[in-house]
Every structure is written in C-alpha cells, then in structure tokens.
From Swiss-Prot:
Gene coding for it: trh
Name recorded for this polypeptide: Pro-thyrotropin-releasing hormone
Chain positions found as Pyrrolidone carboxylic acid: Q70, Q76, Q97, Q114, Q140, Q154, Q175, Q213
Residues recorded as bearing Proline amide in the entry: P72, P78, P99, P116, P142, P156, P177, P215
Lineage of producing organism: Eukaryota, Metazoa, Chordata, Craniata, Vertebrata
Keywords: Amidation, Cleavage on pair of basic residues, Hormone, Pyrrolidone carboxylic acid, Repeat, Secreted, Signal
GO terms, biological process: eating behavior; histamine metabolic process; hormone-mediated signaling pathway; negative regulation of glutamate secretion; positive regulation of gamma-aminobutyric acid secretion; positive regulation of insulin secretion
Location in the cell: Secreted
Amino acid sequence: MRAACVIILASLTVFMSPGLQCQPLAGEGDPSLDELFQRAESLLIRSILTQTEDENHGDGEQTEWLEKRQHPGKRQHPGKREDTDYEDEAAALQKRQHPGKREEEEDSARLRRQHPGKRLSLEHMMLEEPTAQSELAKRQHPGRRYLMLLHKRQHPGRRELHEAAGDFSDLAKRQHPGKRLCEDWDVTGCDQASILLELLDNVNKSRAEEKRQHPGKRFALEDELTEQESL
C-alpha cells in the first residue's frame, strides 16, 4: 500500500512540475463535447476500415493459396462459371469428336427442335441435301454405298424380285451339290435321270401343297389357271 502511494505521489509531482508542463497554444481553448465526439467517431471509423481491409487481404491470400493447391479443372465452382466458358468447352469437345458424330448430334438437335408433325425423316433430309448423301457415302464402305437409297427408290415389285433372286442364290449355295437345280444342261452331273427326278419332286411337292389347302381355295386356283391358259 505504501509503495502504491509513493508511485502516485511521484507521478503527481512529475506532472505538476512547472518545467514539464506544456503551455497551450494561443487561440486554442478547451475542446467542446461536439469536437470530442467527432474525433472519437472518426477514430472508430478509421479503425473499422483498417480492420475490414486486413480481413479482405487475408481472405484474398487464402483463396489464392487454395486455388494453387487445387486441380486446374476444379479451381472454379461449376455454378459460377460464365456462359463463355461453356461455349469454349463445347467447341473444344466438338473438335475432339469424330466428324460423323458431330453431324449426327446436329441432326438429332434439329429434329428435336421441330414440331412432331413436321419432323423430316432421314430419307427426305438426304434427298433434299446432296451434300449429306456424299458425306454418308464417303463414310460407308465402298461396296455398301447408296444401297439403302437405291433400295428405297426402286419399285416394290423390282425390290421383291431382287430379294427373291438373292434368296434363291443363298438357297442354292446351302443345298447339296447333287440337289442344286441344273441351269446348264452341259454341266457334269446334270443328266436326264437327275432332271426327271427333280421334275417328279416338284410335282409331288405341288400336289402336297394342294392337299394342304382349303378345297375352296384349290378350286379358285384351278379356275385361275384355266383362265390363264385360255388367254
């Protein structure tokens, strides 16, 4: 207690000594309460501003450090990406894709944008755009180019004839060499006996088919045959 009193008395003597007192400037009096409030307010505002600047600077440094540690593709949040970034990525993806897939995606997008009743089929699109036909032919095998288009453009009757001829050739290839139809009489193995046997087999097969048919249909077929023979 005595030590505290001694310290207080020493401080008072130092402050009250005439040599150490500061003389006030001329023209300055005691500050009013308004001036004191304004000074305190300015000091508080400055302290708040400096604190916010320090916090922003610290957050910026932290984000830069975090971006450096992350993968280049994950540095930006997906929801904050701009439209330009999406366009650049789409262009880069299209460059990496095969040209045929690019065109297929464009065609599918075009068909989806159209009204269901106005959607064009692939055949009409290819017939209207010759460039699409040439590009499709380039992508296909040389032996298979334009087969689908030619098949669709042909008359249904001719199409059936071609299909029947193809089925007949496939059937002849699958049959035993001794059972194939003799197209040329000079070929070895196609003698008169084999020809007669084939004719008998055909007659027996036709009779068996007639027996399996309905009697009314059988008579109708016979009438048609007689009419054709009379003509």
